[in-house]
């Protein structure tokens, strides 16, 4: 399953839809958040994930989850919630792939 996050972030001061792109992908046991940054500087992104994304993907809104950044191997924890932005740093002209185990 695929869910585009651009429309939920057009008026978001913590996400530049002209320079960043984000979407969710889900399979049977994992959720992936993919964020790309086409800016010439690192950015700290605050990403809105709308409640409709949780409904569409069959996920619980507001769960505290461990995740792995697949390109760096870093592990972290965060809350996937429509009430709070998901915050992550994305290097210049690169992307991050975040994997949550379901």
Give the ranges of each region predicted by the language model:
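Glycan-recognition and catalytic regions of carbohydrate-active enzymes
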Residues: 1-32, 41, 46
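Surface-exposed coil/turn segments at beta-strand junctions on protein surfaces, enriched
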Residues: 16, 26, 40, 81, ...
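Short, well-ordered beta-strand micro-motif
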Residues: 22-24, 34, 97-101
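Short, glycine-/Ser/Thr-/acidic-enriched flexible segments
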Residues: 28, 38-41, 52, 72, ...
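Conserved, mostly hydrophobic/aromatic
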Residues: 33, 37, 67
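Surface-exposed beta-strand/loop patches in extracellular or lumenal glycoproteins
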Residues: 39-60
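Solvent-exposed beta-strand/loop surfaces of large extracellular or lumenal domains
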Residues: 63-85
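C-terminal beta-strand-rich structural cap/linker in extracellular carbohydrate-active enzymes
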Residues: 78-102
